[in-house]
């Protein structure tokens, strides 16, 4: 309400319309749709314009569909036409806190906009259906936290002792209604979303003009007349003041929760003061960057040293592998030592001794040569003869392959045991390499055979599974 040029007429603003005191006194030219609003304002002309209350908005749009329908269950809550549900300890629990304070959650404005949620005079009407109480409970139901404040404000509502839409049928759950009002944070979020929809092409003047129009359409009329007495000022303040939010009993928080809240508060504060040029920033020189560079160089030097050690170990293995592949000394047949002898003069035997003529060399079949047995560990040949049918012959290559397979299985078990004890990969490799050298082979050959055995086992399992599937079919 403003006084114009010291005259006796006042100017009121309601829903963006500027009206003078003469318009209230001369109601003949006013349309029927505006009569209710003007008469409501005219009743308070002697005092001042009372701002809109939430129960007034609820009563005005009681016949309209609610903006949101919330179903509250014992262990979860969900909105109407929602596939899943939210838990009370989940990340969406802040919505219930905003509903309890009767405020629009600013983080959900984009979701409301994409879902085409209806706004009534910039507010959201919420219908809350409580499914937590059993059907056998009494009809006198404890009110919902979000609607207790509403019932305290609505002194003219004749239904105060039981929730709205409550019927004598005990099977129907109690229903409550509340209104979520906008805040400066939601207004700022609306302007940001609108600017993004125009690809940030709006100027500052256009945004300020838009903000002023929104405030004219949604906020209550202003009262700018100074009070004449202290009692009148107290009356003005009581009528303009909003009721306090409902008191809640907070559970005692632990040190971890308090630390998280403090960190979140500091993060928000730093975000708000990010572009503040007058903010004093203490200059504290540190050497964190130099320490980081030193740590990187040290790690690189350690990696290079490890690579050098690995290369040296591989070279040592390659040098020892030819020696390790040679058979042991006790298995090698000692070759006859050739002595240098001077050539002797061949003497013919006397004529009295008759020398028999040389016999031609007999040819034996091919399988006869295979019947000869190789020398045993002592260097002597085994007795020749036919080999029994129940004792198959094994070649040296097959014997070595069986030995390497056994070593591969033993190495796998040994590696798993060392790994369970906490040995590093380098230690396991060094231990297995020593054992392979002691067994007369190298670690690379054993690991290759181990991989082949692993692949063969996998193939056998796949074949067995395929056979089982075919048998089931």
Curated annotation (Swiss-Prot):
Gene Ontology molecular function: transcription coactivator activity
Compartment annotation: Nucleus; Cytoplasm
A single Gene Ontology CC term: cytoplasm
Region (Disordered), start-end ranges: 134-179, 304-385
Subcellular location, principal: nucleus
Any GO BP annotation: septin ring organization
UniProt keyword annotations, A-Z: Cytoplasm, Nucleus, Transcription, Transcription regulation
Biased composition (Low complexity): 142-163, 304-327, 361-377
Pfam families linked to this entry: Spt20_SEP (PF12090)
Skewed-composition ranges (Polar residues): 335-344
Reported consequences of knocking out the gene: Leads to decreased growth at high temperature and sensitivity to several drugs like hydroxyurea, caffeine, canavanine and rapamycin; as well as to raffinose.
InterPro entries: Spt20, Spt20-like_SEP
Assembly description: Component of the 1.8 MDa SAGA (Spt-Ada-Gcn5 acetyltransferase) complex, which is composed of 19 subunits tra1, spt7, taf5, ngg1/ada3, sgf73, spt20, spt8, taf12, taf6, hfi1/ada1, ubp8, gcn5, ada2, spt3, sgf29, taf10, taf9, sgf11 and sus1.
Its biological purpose: Component of the transcription coactivator SAGA complex. SAGA acts as a general cofactor required for essentially all RNA polymerase II transcription. At the promoters, SAGA is required for transcription pre-initiation complex (PIC) recruitment. It influences RNA polymerase II transcriptional activity through different activities such as TBP interaction (via core/TAF module) and promoter selectivity, interaction with transcription activators (via Tra1/SPT module), and chromatin modification through histone acetylation (via HAT module) and deubiquitination (via DUB module).
Family: Belongs to the SPT20 family.
Name this polypeptide is given: SAGA complex subunit Spt20
Species of provenance: Schizosaccharomyces pombe (strain 972 / ATCC 24843)
Gene that produces this protein: spt20
């Amino acid at each position: 309400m403003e006084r114009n040029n010291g005259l006796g007429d006042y100017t009121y603003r309601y829903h963006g319309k500027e009206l003078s005191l003469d318009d209230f006194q001369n109601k003949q030219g006013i349309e029927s749709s505006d009569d209710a609003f003007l008469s409501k304002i005219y009743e308070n002309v002697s005092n001042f314009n009372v701002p809109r209350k939430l129960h007034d908005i609820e009563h005005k749009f009681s016949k309209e569909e609610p903006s949101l329908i919330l179903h509250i269950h014992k262990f979860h809550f969900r909105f109407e036409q929602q596939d899943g549900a939210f838990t009370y300890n989940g990340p969406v629990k802040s919505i219930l806190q905003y509903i309890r304070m009767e405020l629009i959650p600013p983080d959900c404005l984009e979701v409301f906009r994409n879902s085409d949620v209806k706004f009534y005079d910039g507010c959201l009407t919420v219908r809350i259906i409580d499914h937590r109480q059993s059907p056998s409970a009494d009809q006198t139901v404890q009110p919902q936290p979000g609607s207790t404040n509403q019932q305290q404000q609505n002194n003219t509502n004749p239904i105060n002792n039981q929730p709205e839409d409550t019927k004598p049928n005990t099977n129907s759950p109690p229903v409550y209604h509340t209104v979520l009002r906008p805040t400066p944070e939601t207004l700022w979020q609306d302007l940001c979303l609108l600017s993004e929809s125009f690809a940030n092409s709006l100027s500052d003047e256009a945004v300020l003009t838009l903000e002023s129009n929104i405030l004219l359409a949604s906020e209550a009329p202003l009262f700018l007349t100074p009070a004449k007495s202290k009692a009148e000022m107290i009356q003005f303040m009581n009528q303009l003041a909003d009721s306090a939010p409902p008191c809640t009993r907070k559970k005692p928080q632990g040190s971890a929760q308090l630390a998280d809240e403090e960190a979140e508060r500091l993060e928000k504060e730093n975000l708000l003061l990010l572009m503040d040029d007058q903010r004093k920033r203490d200059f504290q020189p540190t050497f964190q960057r130099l320490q980081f560079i030193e740590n990187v160089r040290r790690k690189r030097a350690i990696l290079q040293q490890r690579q050098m050690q690995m290369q040296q170990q591989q070279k040592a293995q390659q040098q020892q592998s030819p020696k390790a592949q040679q058979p042991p000394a006790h298995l090698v047949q000692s070759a006859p030592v050739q002595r240098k002898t001077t050539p002797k003069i061949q003497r013919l035997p006397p004529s009295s001794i008759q020398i028999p003529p040389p016999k031609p060399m007999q040819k034996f079949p091919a399988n006869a040569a295979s019947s000869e047995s190789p020398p045993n560990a002592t260097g002597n040949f085994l007795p020749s003869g036919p080999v029994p049918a129940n004792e198959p012959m094994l070649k040296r290559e097959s014997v070595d392959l069986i030995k390497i397979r056994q070593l591969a299985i033993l190495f796998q078990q040994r590696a798993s045991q060392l790994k369970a004890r906490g040995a590093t990969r380098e230690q396991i490799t060094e231990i297995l390499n020593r054992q392979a050298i002691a067994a007369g082979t190298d670690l690379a050959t054993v690991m290759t055979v181990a991989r082949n055995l692993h692949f063969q086992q996998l193939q056998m399992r796949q074949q067995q599974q395929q056979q089982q599937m075919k048998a089931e079919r």
